[in-house]
């Protein structure tokens, strides 16, 4: 498990450094991808964590998804390389952005719901 954290950190660094040489669109999408690496690591840890640790991991996921969502909303569809090259229309670029934002909103909503459910489960004494 320790190696997965190291690998995730290395991938995060590569993605961030790689994003520095690309367009604004590329930097923004690279940041979203870098956060996704962190989210994958947190989701992996959820599988074997105890209840208290899960709450912390859900907080981490909520923070990651919130950051991704904030960044995704800043995407300018006109800076999409596919739009600039003419392979998609502006409407398709806008749809792509909206789909990405909607997906991130669903992930955030699910993490919040799962976290709240776990908090209620922990707070509710077991029925005897």
Question: What spans do the regions from the language model cover?
Answer:
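Intrinsically disordered, glycine/charged-rich N-terminal periplasmic/extracytoplasmic linker segments
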Residues: 54-128
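Sec-dependent bacterial lipoprotein signal peptides
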Residues: 1-21
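Generic alpha-helix initiation/capping and coil-helix boundary signal
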Residues: 1-6, 32-35, 65, 86, ...
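Intrinsic-disorder/low-complexity regions
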Residues: 2, 23, 29, 49, ...
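Generic detector of low-complexity/intrinsically disordered segments
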Residues: 13-14, 48, 110, 120
């Amino acid at each position: 498990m320790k190696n997965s954290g190291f690998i995730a950190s290395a991938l995060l660094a590569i993605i961030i450094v790689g994003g520095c040489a690309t367009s604004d669109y590329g930097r923004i999408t690279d940041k979203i991808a870098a956060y996704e690496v962190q989210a994958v690591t947190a989701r992996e840890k959820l599988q074997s964590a105890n209840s208290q640790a899960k709450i912390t991991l859900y907080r981490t996921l909520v923070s990651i998804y919130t950051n991704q969502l904030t960044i995704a909303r800043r995407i300018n569809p006109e800076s999409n390389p596919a739009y600039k090259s003419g392979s998609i229309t502006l409407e398709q670029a806008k749809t792509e952005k909206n789909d990405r934002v909607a997906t991130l909103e669903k992930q955030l909503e699910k993490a919040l719901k799962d976290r709240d459910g776990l908090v209620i489960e922990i707070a509710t004494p077991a029925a005897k």
